[in-house]
Amino acid sequence: MVYDENCSYCAEGALLDAFGIKIGELPMSKVILFKEQSHRGRVIVACKRHVDDITDLTKEERIQFMEDVSHVAEILHELFHPDKINFGAYGDTMHHLHFHLVRDV
């Protein structure tokens, strides 16, 4: 796995603690509960491998990563019964592939 010691998602520890709490791991990703919970259940699904873009993954990795994202969305639906889950993949400040999953209010 590619690793960047300066990346919050790779290094975890104090870098990650600033904004989130790691709550689980899936085959291709880490699941992080976002500390700012203006939308209850807001989580981040971050790729275990340090890549900037989904196109940097192999086809098999891409399929598994999206399976992980879908699995987390299913759990959010079970827990919160939202009308919709919003998926955000900005990549503007964190150059590590991750999705924000935010339920509607």
Language model regions located:
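HIT superfamily nucleotide-processing domains
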Residues: 1-105
